[in-house]
Amino acid sequence: LKAIRIKLPPQTETLTADILTIDRAWLDERELGNRFNVVLSDMAPATSGNKGLDAARSFQLCQAALSIAEMVLKPGGSFICKIFQDEEFNEFADNVRNRFKHHKIFKPRSSRKQSKEIFIVGMGFKG
């Protein structure tokens, strides 16, 4: 993954890490458990041109983001994640559905018609 720098509001905290290596111990060490109202993942893998491989990598990133969300969200919190839609999408949607009171799936109007990019939103984290 390529880390990028973005300008954030002053009250924002940032952490830099490889999302695929973050676990409960890493979060506990930084006292990050159950502190957040929202987890937003706009991650996407570097695309290879192989749609199946790109979608599988996207699924892996989204599963990692959801795993982190489960550890850091306050009850009632929200999760937003961009994923490339393919055959694993339904599995990911079910994972979100099982952890949140409400969920919504949408494709932004700004996305190209042929793009497999889609967003899933979970609201009301069950904790």
Predicted regions and their residues:
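Surface-exposed loop/turn positions
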Residues: 12, 76-77
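S-adenosyl-L-methionine
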Residues: 1-47
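A short glycine-rich, Lys/Arg-flanked "PGG" loop and its adjoining helix->strand segment in the class I
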Residues: 57-75
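Short catalytic-loop micro-motif centered on adjacent basic/acidic residues
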Residues: 78-82
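Class I S-adenosyl-L-methionine
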Residues: 83-127
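Short amphipathic alpha-helical segments
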Residues: 28, 51-53, 92-94
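Glycine/threonine-rich flexible loop motifs
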Residues: 47-58
